[in-house]
Design a protein with these regions (language model features):
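A short coil-to-beta-strand element that immediately follows conserved catalytic motifs
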Residues: 60-62, 196-202, 283-295
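Active-site lid/adjacent beta-loop-alpha segment flanking the redox-cofactor pocket in flavoenzymes
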Residues: 211-317
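Dinucleotide-binding Rossmann-like beta1-alpha1 core, especially the glycine-rich loop
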Residues: 24-103, 227-229, 263
Length: 349
């Protein structure tokens, strides 16, 4: 689109087959950081643009979201989101217990002190979204090569020269963007560059189908007091929980394919046992709820919770896009645009 020259995308696996395939993909619009809201809005704009360009639907599920507060601390957080949403023009309203129960048939509404409903929030299938990005990029002239693992970034005299693939093939380029997610630092270490993030396990559980109790496309929820989120899933309920001590991983132990990596799945019931009591006041039978599936994967968390996007000072032509802090699907469109503008020397949006 920006006439930036020849662009090549290299993916070590099939597109959308790794971390993005293990995400809940909540496109939450309201954030306490204004810049992050801009990035998320750009993703929504990208989805609309891609659908128009390809003349096909990416099946965005405009289900809305409900943020729930049941303590003084979570109420302050809710109020901050409410203020941010109003400032950014995002539709929102506080709803009472009766309306909460109507929208969320599974919830114990008496546990809800305050509920903030944002009807334009959505979720999306990451495979469809990533496939949409790829198809649109190809249509606009980008060359895509999947199953091409990058072995090293080539530099000479503090300037990027390209990359070398695992096959030994050298690909020359004056600009290299390291967007390798959890694997990004493996490519940076030989260059004596460290990106300030750590791969941390994120996970969720999916219940058995009960379409009456968990109707399709009911609003997803964010429940800070339970360190939890929920999302509909074809008649089941996705339950995401954050344990008190999150498990991080040495990136050098990561396998080339995440399906071959052990995210300590043996601990999934231990984690559920630890976190379930916090959610029980909202989902009373969580102890007995049939669980059909468990999903885990890495999220790249940064100490200051800010994304790592832009040029690497040590090497001319080297850029990075990583450290998405669990928000890569939601903010991906904005992250891509910001990276492109920085590479081209344009004023960031």
């Amino acid at each position: 689109k920006r006439h930036a020259g020849n662009i090549l995308l290299l993916d070590g696996n099939e597109i959308a087959s790794q971390a993005s395939a293990r995400a809940a993909c909540l496109l939450t619009r309201a954030r306490t950081k204004p810049a992050l809201m801009e990035l998320v809005q750009e993703t929504y704009d990208c989805i609309e643009e891609i659908e128009s360009l390809l003349d096909e639907s990416l099946e965005l599920q405009m289900c809305g979201s409900i943020t729930i507060a049941s303590s003084e601390a979570s109420l302050k957080g809710l109020e901050a989101l409410e203020e941010a949403a109003c400032r950014f023009g995002i539709p929102n309203e506080r709803i009472g217990k009766e309306r909460v129960k109507e929208l969320l048939p599974w919830i114990e509404e008496e546990a809800v002190d305050v509920a903030l409903y944002m009807p334009t929030d959505a979720f999306i299938d990451s495979a469809l979204l990533c496939s949409g990005y790829a198809k649109a990029a190809r249509k606009l002239g980008v060359t895509l090569r999947s199953n091409c693992k990058v072995k090293e970034i080539l530099v000479e005299d503090a300037e990027v020269k390209g990359v070398r693939l695992a096959t030994g093939e050298a690909v020359t380029a004056p600009v290299v963007v390291n967007a390798a997610g959890s694997w990004a630092n493996l490519l940076m270490r030989p260059l004596k560059v460290g990106l300030p993030f750590t791969p941390v396990r994120s996970h969720f559980w999916i219940t058995s189908i009960d379409a009456t109790r968990f109707p399709a496309n009911h609003p997803f929820t964010i429940i800070p007091d339970a360190r939890a989120f929920t999302r509909s899933d074809v008649g089941g309920l996705i339950i995401g929980l954050r344990e008190s001590q999150c498990q991080s991983f040495d990136l050098s132990t990561l396998t080339e394919k995440l399906e071959d990596f052990d995210f300590n799945k043996a601990a999934k019931w231990t984690v559920l046992d630890e976190c379930a009591p916090l959610l029980k006041k909202y989902l009373k039978d969580i102890d007995d709820l049939p669980i059909a599936h468990y999903m885990s994967g890495p999220s790249c968390y940064v100490p200051d919770a800010k994304f790592i996007i832009g040029p690497v000072a040590r090497y001319k032509g080297l850029h990075t896009v990583t450290g998405c802090c669990g928000g890569g699907v939601a903010a991906g469109g904005g992250m891509g645009r910001l990276a492109a503008e920085l590479i081209l020397g344009e004023t960031p949006f």
